[in-house]
A protein has these predicted regions:
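Conserved beta-strand-loop-alpha-helix hinge in the C-terminal portion
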Residues: 174-203
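Conserved coupling/switch loops of ABC nucleotide-binding domains, chiefly the family-specific signature
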Residues: 64-67, 177
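ABC ATPase NBD coupling module
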Residues: 74-88, 98-100
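The feature captures the beta-strand-to-loop junction immediately N-terminal to the Walker
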Residues: 43-45
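A short, flexible loop at the N-terminus of ABC-type nucleotide-binding domains that lies
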Residues: 1-32
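Helix-to-loop junction immediately C-terminal to a conserved catalytic motif
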Residues: 58
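Conserved catalytic loops of ABC-family nucleotide-binding domains
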Residues: 139-161
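Conserved ABC transporter NBD signature motif
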Residues: 66-74
Length: 204
């Protein structure tokens, strides 16, 4: 049996208030696996941990506990410069965060892949002019058809954003309250009480 495309096994990330004040400030717990190619929608409030989730999958942010496995590879054991051959995080320049390396590169293993298996789109900008949206949706579908796993994270501020998620995504996650909750389809996620509170007037 082949390894899942992505598995987060008992993963948690804990941030503390500071070097001297070790009081927990934020915790995110994640546990799921995805075996088949798909386009996955991700929603959640600002500061809920969506970018932290993507950083852990891409291997730039080390989990406090647990393992992130991409196509059978433990991301924290893959050479730093080769991690984006397994999972690549597309984000805005203001989102880039630097994290210390936890072990020397010579102790790490090669990625074993020349093209990313997991593609993480963190709040992509959907330009409504000149067919750009259609181009992006076709790109996401092409990646899936090439047996890749695609995550599209949006913070909906307009009905268009929900329409795009409904059109392109086959399953969903909602990040909030320190957890990452799975939903089988668009109808299920927008019917959830927590999600409706988050969406506000867009849920009506």
């Amino acid at each position: 049996m082949s390894a899942p495309l992505l598995a987060l096994d008992g993963v948690s990330k804990l941030y503390r208030r500071g070097l001297l004040d070790r009081t927990p400030a934020f915790r995110l717990d994640v546990d799921f696996r995805i075996d088949e190619p798909a386009i996955v929608g991700v929603m959640g409030p600002n500061g809920a941990g969506k970018t932290t989730l993507f950083e852990m999958i891409a291997g730039s942010n080390t989990p406090t506990e647990g393992r992130v496995m991409v196509a059978g590879h433990d991301m924290q054991r893959v050479r730093y410069r080769e991690r984006d051959r397994l999972a690549i995080h597309y984000h805005q320049s203001y989102q880039v965060r630097r994290f210390p390396r936890t072990r020397p590169n010579f102790m790490l293993e090669p990625a074993g892949s020349s093209y990313p298996v997991v593609h993480l789109f963190d709040e992509p900008q959907f330009n409504t002019q000149d067919g750009y949206i259609g181009f992006m949706l076709d790109f996401f579908r092409r990646l899936r058809d090439e047996r890749r796993l695609v995550f599209v994270c949006l913070h909906p501020t307009a009905a268009l954003h929900l329409e795009l998620l409904n059109e392109i995504c086959e399953r969903f996650f909602f990040v909030g309250g320190g957890a990452v909750r799975p939903f089988a389809d668009f109808g299920t996620i927008v019917a959830d009480a927590d999600v409706r509170r988050y969406l506000g007037a867009l849920a009506d």
